Structures are given as C-alpha cells and as structure tokens.
Amino acid sequence: MKKSLVILSLLASANAFAGSIDYLAQQDAEYFAHPAMIGKVGVSGAYYNPAGTVFLEDGLYVQLNSQTLFKTYEMDTKENFGGLSHESDHPSAFVPSIQIVKKEGDRSYFLHAGAAAGGGSVKYKNGISAFEVIGQEIHSGLQGLSPNNKVHYLGGSTVNGSSYYINTTFGIAQKINPKFSVAGGLRFMYAMRELNGTASYDLNLTGEEAIKKENVRVDIDSERTGWGVGGVLGFNYQPTEKLNIGFKYETEVELNLDADGKLDTTKTGKFNGKGEFIKDLIINKIDGNLEAHPVIAEWLEDDRRNLPAMMALGVSYELTDRITLLTSGNYYFIKDANRNGCYENYDNGYEISVGVDYKLNDKWTLMAGYQYTDTGANENTYKDTDYALDADMYGVGVKYTPDETKEFIVSYAYVDYKNGTAVNEKGHETTTFKKEVNAVGLSAAFKF
C-alpha cells in the first residue's frame, strides 16, 4: 500500500498509509473501499490499469479525489536507551489526486497526477527516539574518556517531518483486437523531504548526581529534493464479458536527492570546570556521533534513493448481475533499487488484495475489501525517519451513480500495522515502532 509505505508521512516510508517502502498505492477513494483495483476497467485505470481505459465508452472522463488520513505514529524507546515514548497524531487533512481519460475508438489517452509516495507530514512531541539512542551512544563514548562521565537526554522540541513524492503519469492505450489492449506512458516524479527539530542534553563530567540543566543543544534543519523520470507499461485482456485481467509494470525511477541541511551543536554551561580543551573534545565527539548516526546522516548529504520498480496483476469477475469479485497483487523490486545502500537489508515487498462490489440497484453500489502488505522491511531497516511496517487494511465504501455521466464515492479504510522493533549493530533492541491509520476517501467522476 505502498506502494508503499510509504516514507509515509515522513517517518514511515512506506507508507503514510500503505504500500511498500516509498510507495503509496491509494490514489483514489475507491481504493479505500477495495484495494484490488488492477483488474478493473474505469477512470481509475489511468493509474491502476492504464491498458483497461481503452475498454471505456467513447468520451472524456475526469475524476477528482480527496483523501483524509488520521494517523497515529508512536516510537517507544527501550529502557536501556532512555525509555521515553514519542507520538505524532498530526493528520493529513487533504491529499488530492486527479485522473483524466480521453477514449476515442480503439485508442485512449490517460493522465494521472497525485502523491505516488510520502503523502503527508508528522509532528513528534518531545523529539524522536533517535535523540535518546544518540544520547546513550554519546554516554558510552564519553565513558571511554572517563568512567565517571554521564549524559542525560533532557527532551526535545516538536520534531517536524514531511515527505512528498509528486507524480504525474500520462500515456496512450491501444486495442490490438476486441479482447486485448496494451498501454505505455511516462512518469515524472518530484520528491521533497524535510526534517527539523532540537535535542537537549545535560553532561555531567564528574559522575555525581547533579541538577539537570541544559548545556548542550543540538538543532537539525534539513530539506532534500530531487526529481526523476520512469515509464509504465501495461496490458488488459477481456476473454469474456464477465472476466477482465489487468497488468501493469512501473520502471524504477532514479532519484538523486540534493540535501540542504545543517546540524548545529550549541554549548552552554562551564562543563564542571573541565576547561575549554575538554569541552571542545566532548563537543566534537558529540558532533561526530550525531553526524555518523544513520537517522541524522541521511539528512546532511546528497544521496541517491531510487523509487523501486513494481509489477501488478489483477482480475475482476462478474459473478452475477449484482456481484463483482476482485483480486490483485503488487510486487515491489526493492532489492534491485539498492544502488548505494539506501535499501540495505530490505527484502522485496508485496501486497495481496481482495474485494467485492454489490450492486443494490442502478444507482447504488456497496463495496468492501481487504489487503495484506509485506513491506520488505525488518528490524535491521527500521529507523525514526523510515519505518515501513507490515499491515492489514480493511475497507468499505458506497458508490452513487445518479446518471451515466456522474459517479460519486465515499469510502473508509482502517489500517492495522504490525509493531516493529529496531536493533542496532550490536543486536540490541532500541525502539519499537507503532502505527495506526483511519482514512476517508471522496471522489467525483464526470463524463463529457
């Protein structure tokens, strides 16, 4: 659902909602009702099944979509690394997308624009888990200078993060014969990621218990941007009037992210009278530890983070005049996109979806569906700014078709993420990550 995950709303790849790694597959309201969209023929096919758009009736179709995501993300640091909890409940109030299809005879032209990945922002109160873990690592390092040295994490400001991968896809679909069609197009991607926050530490260089006061403050402020171009290929096969099979392949998109960021360490206090030499030695050690930490390092330097290729296959079957069954699967080639270690330790991700449409009458249709997402992430990949968690998604929706030229959808989905715990290079558990999302989708489609 992810295409995945997301980097979700920043701290989540994957996923702001669902998907694998930096992918978001929810591109319209109908997806929330039943995510098995690849085998359907409709305006949504501009994204999910482009080759299927040529099986629409002749005309110009425009579909407008809005998503509202109520997200709760939580990081619980293990006791030996600080034991604090950090939570973000900042919603993504409006995530829009649009699909346009022009069908003429045996050919159609399609366009989709929306958030292909990322999908929002997060705000963690009292910093993030990495600040505590870094504090413990600094503590261990300073004890190498003197066993009496101690470091205490005093807390942090609200950490703001955001991640948006804006995608525009357009192309052409062509019928080869009455049952088979092919499609091809280009995808343009622009990525924007931001992170800023503050951490405060007390350094006790005597080892004695003292009144906690800030004497080191660390500020990070970073923005990373990049763009890339990829392709999309697809086919649609309709062996009977009741059965439809759709296929889509999206190529890997090369994204070179340019970093505009800085890490500032502000020193206050007298450091227990240890003098300027010791102060500078300690502060330099703090700077070095922070800049070397994976969560911080990626925000301070240019990097290549490609969007993985993905392949999708789906089937829709009209069981009766009222009931249509749906199923589809997505596969993400994450390991192939690991050009410079950005997806180190990841496995490939996949999703399996099922759904059903039940037509009450000519105007009203009920929809329901389920999806399981395996993001390919694990305890060796989770970090504060990128934790793609496996998930179960349950969705329902209703479609209203007042006439042949208009269609409206309201949908709801609940995403139940499986908790994940990160381990460091020594095999010690550091942080447990949790997520929960409630999503509402609205769409309006018009035929001209």
Regions of interest found by a model, annotated:
Residues 400-402, 435-448:
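Outer-membrane beta-barrel "beta-signal"
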Residues 62-70, 111-115, 184-188, 247-251, ...:
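Transmembrane beta-barrel strands of outer-membrane/channel proteins
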Residues 60, 106-109, 179-182, 242-245, ...:
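Repeated loop/turn-to-beta-strand initiation elements of outer-membrane beta-barrel proteins
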Residues 44, 91-96, 164-168, 225-231, ...:
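Residues that define the transmembrane beta-barrel architecture of outer-membrane proteins
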Residues 16-121, 387:
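N-terminal, post-signal peptide beta-strand-biased segments of exported outer-membrane/organellar beta-barrel
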Residues 69-73, 114-120, 189-194, 250-256, ...:
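Structural signature of outer-membrane beta-barrel domains
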Residues 54, 102-104, 174, 233, ...:
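Residue-level signature of outer-membrane beta-barrel architecture
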Residues 125-155, 192-222, 257-300, 337, ...:
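Solvent-exposed loop segments that connect transmembrane elements
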